[in-house]
Regions:
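Acidic, glycine-rich loop-and-strand cores that form catalytic or ligand-binding grooves
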Residues: 27-65
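Short acidic DE-rich linear segments
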Residues: 128-135
């Protein structure tokens, strides 16, 4: 079965990984403005782990493509760009947990879990963000 048919929510990802969706990071002692981003990051890592179906990036393999969702704000509002190591390069021996095994999964996650990405990336959603201006 296509994993994108199976993982449509954080709860679906938890079910696929045998995790309790109610077991979220404890953020009560953190500043209020940081809490939502910490929980969103955790949820994204769970979702991405489920979508990747056990695949983990090999950071020693320079020939293995790894896909990330990149976002930026321009004067028109919130925008999206997909990249991989063929388009841009960063050297690290510690991997990103927000890494996908293929571009299809990266795009799917960006479209399906956009609100989690926004919670992770911004303390406040920019007022110039227009949900209809996806690139």
């Amino acid at each position: 079965m296509d994993i994108t048919k199976k993982i449509k929510s954080y709860e679906d990802a938890c079910k696929a990984l045998n995790l309790d969706p109610a077991n979220l990071p404890v953020v009560d002692n953190l500043p209020e403005k940081d809490r939502k981003y910490i929980v969103a990051y955790y949820k994204l890592t769970v979702i991405i782990r489920a979508l990747n179906e056990g695949w983990e990036p090999n950071w020693q393999d320079w020939d293995e493509y790894k896909y990330f969702n990149w976002f930026y704000i321009d004067f028109a509002g919130f925008a999206y760009a997909l990249t991989n190591c063929a388009v841009s390069y960063a050297n690290t021996y510690f991997g990103s947990r927000l890494c996908f095994k293929n571009a299809t999964l990266a795009r799917y996650a960006r479209e399906t879990f956009e609100s989690l990405y926004l919670d992770y990336l911004f303390i406040e959603i920019p007022q110039t963000y227009n949900n209809n201006s996806k690139k």
